[in-house]
Amino acid sequence: MISSVAIATNLIPASKFTIEQLASIYNQTRVDYLVPMPMNALRLAEYISTYDVDLEHSLVALQDDRLLGVAMLGVREGRAWLTRLGVLPNTRRNGIGEALMLGLIAQAEKLHIHFDMLEVIKDNAPAHRLFLKLGFYDVGELLVLRRPPFNQPPDTVVADAERLD
């Protein structure tokens, strides 16, 4: 059952917002996220370009001029990637995430795409339940390895060699 909050929520194309506004709402939805993933406007613009995010078909949830959430749609070769779903923490569990997801699925269908995929952080049980409810299913586990940034070149190894005849 979708709540009255979700019913009163408008889904607006993300293209109607600036990159700065999108970065702001995205970051607000992630303040308590399992894995910190903040993005400034420049980094979000790079993400949009790298992952072929279609802002015209991506969505922002809006109610009474208040941004409540965001969801983005990446499009490549007949496939849709539903990504960057986020809902403000104090408005979660009211159907906004579901409304955004259903909106993205509808946007993909408008593009004649019927293969939708997504990723979810392993311990994000609420999102995982939502995705299963919407007909998605697990196909595997993606392992992401990260190393700390490397700021200086490694020390040069100096070796001495001597010819032995």
Language model regions located:
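A conserved beta-turn-beta hairpin within the catalytic core of GNAT-like acetyltransferases
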Residues: 74-83, 92
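A short beta-loop-alpha structural element at the N-terminal edge
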Residues: 8-24, 156-165
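A short, internal acetyl-CoA/4′-phosphopantetheine-binding micro-motif in the GNAT/acyltransferase core
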Residues: 60-62, 85-92, 121
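Active-site rim helix/loop that mediates acceptor-substrate recognition in acyltransferases
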Residues: 23-30, 34-72
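Conserved catalytic-core motifs of GNAT/GCN5-like acyltransferases
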Residues: 119-121, 132, 137-150
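Conserved GNAT acetyl-CoA-binding A-motif
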Residues: 101, 108-121
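Short strand-connecting beta-turns/loops that link adjacent beta-strands
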Residues: 64-67, 75-79, 123, 139
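Conserved acetyl-CoA-binding loop-helix of GNAT-fold acetyltransferases
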Residues: 87, 93-106, 129-133
